[in-house]
């Protein structure tokens, strides 16, 4: 069956997840024009599809995304994580339970190297730790690859899902994935709204829209001082036929 003929997944809300989506705050000016409301902590396990994704690309794994893996138990999983402190847990956890490949490098807009800030036991960032003033963290140099230099369309089983959570580096990951986006059926990206040194949310939309993606859902959000600082946006291509 050709890729075009494969059934395309459609992301739906579970009734319970829908009830949990009580409106608390409107999005700030960066995304208010989209006319969306903010979800109040709905995890990735609330995603449903008619057929299930066959390939999941988890970029910025850290300790893993178990709710996402559990939702699609038959999917092949590609794990992308440059921070070595997370490898033992991944190798004794999800990699023993599932069909996975661990890619021990960062993803970005160009191939090369970058400085990774190890911001504690649960976080790492290529953008530094400006949001943690007065604190210092160890740094290491890690390799960086473009996603579309690592995987080709022919390497993916369809439907395929791309999830990105890279602590403010999401735009660069998408810029390095453009040649692969035609083979991706849905994208979940953590979008940051309050980091002046990161990107504008509109830039995420500008990359995905030309490839036919539309914003269809908003999952878990982070709110600080009654302002949304980041949220998980779900994009997919409209169903046809």
Tell me what each language-model feature is.
Residues 2-241:
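Phosphate/nucleotide-binding beta-alpha loop and adjacent structural elements of enzyme active sites
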């Amino acid at each position: 069956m050709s890729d075009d003929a494969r059934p395309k997944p459609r992301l739906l809300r579970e009734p319970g997840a829908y009830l949990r989506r009580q409106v608390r705050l409107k999005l700030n000016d960066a995304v208010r024009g989209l006319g969306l409301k903010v979800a109040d902590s709905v995890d990735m396990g609330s995603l449903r599809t008619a057929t299930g994704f066959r390939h999941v690309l988890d970029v910025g794994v850290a300790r893993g995304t178990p709710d996402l893996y559990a939702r699609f138990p038959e999917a092949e999983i590609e794990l992308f994580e440059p921070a070595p402190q997370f490898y033992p847990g991944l190798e004794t956890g999800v990699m023993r339970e599932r069909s996975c490949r661990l890619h021990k490098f960062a993803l970005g807009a160009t191939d090369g190297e970058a400085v990774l800030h190890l911001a504690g036991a649960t976080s790492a960032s290529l953008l530094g730790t400006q949001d943690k003033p007065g604190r210092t963290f160890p740094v290491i140099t890690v390799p960086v690859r473009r996603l579309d230099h690592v995987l080709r369309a022919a390497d993916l089983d369809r439907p395929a899902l791309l999830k990105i959570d890279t602590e403010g580096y999401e735009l660069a990951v998408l810029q390095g994935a453009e040649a692969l986006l035609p083979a991706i059926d849905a994208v979940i990206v953590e979008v940051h709204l309050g980091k002046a040194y990161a990107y504008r949310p509109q830039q995420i939309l500008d990359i995905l829209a030309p490839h036919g993606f539309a914003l269809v859902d908003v999952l878990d959000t982070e709110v600080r001082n009654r302002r949304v600082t980041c949220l998980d946006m779900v994009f997919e291509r409209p169903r046809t036929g």
